[in-house]
Amino acid sequence: MDEAYYSGNLESVLGYVSDMHTELASISQLVIAKIETIDNDILNKDIVNFIMCRSNLDNPFISFLDTVYTIIDQENYQTELINSLDDNEIIDCIVNKFMSFYKDNLENIVDAIITLKYIMNNPDFKTTYAEVLGSRIADIDIKQVIRENILQLSNDIRERYL
């Protein structure tokens, strides 16, 4: 799919957009259906593992994050932005993104998770911040925010990126 997106072939691009649109809608419905059955500790652990590039795609919310990450990654803006920052700016970014976890806004939470995933692609930051990241996220309960906002966020992502 990624090659089709970059090839410039209109038919391939339209197929990619349609596939991602369908996948995002489908996974959003699965998240709504399954979110109550997922233990909060497991959800938080899976979020940390997603950020650290070890995804449990059996967790529907992690599958949702993976799909959003794939869609947004096509834009490459995030990678360019992260790569342009020095270490102090990245640390500031990490601190600012953590604040998003304490707000009842799923878009900000998903943005924070995906940005942290980009940052943790750097082995130096992964080594330094993995433990702190895990302990901070372990204290957060975002299931209610997910339940209430997943459909709207899914629609917003489709409108913005697809």
From Swiss-Prot:
Plays a role in the inhibition of host NF-kappa-B activation. Interacts with host BTRC and thereby diminishes ubiquitination of NF-kappa-B inhibitor alpha/NFKBIA. This stabilizes NFKBIA and its interaction with NF-kappaB, so retaining p65/RELA in the cytoplasm and preventing NF-kappa-B-dependent gene expression. One of its GO terms (cellular component) is host cell nucleus. InterPro entries: Orthopox_A49. This is Protein A49R. Keywords: Host cytoplasm, Host nucleus, Host-virus interaction, Inhibition of host NF-kappa-B by virus. Belongs to the poxviridae A49 protein family. Pfam families: Orthopox_A49R (PF06489). Interacts with host BTRC; this interaction inhibits NF-kappa-B activation. Transmembrane segments: none annotated.
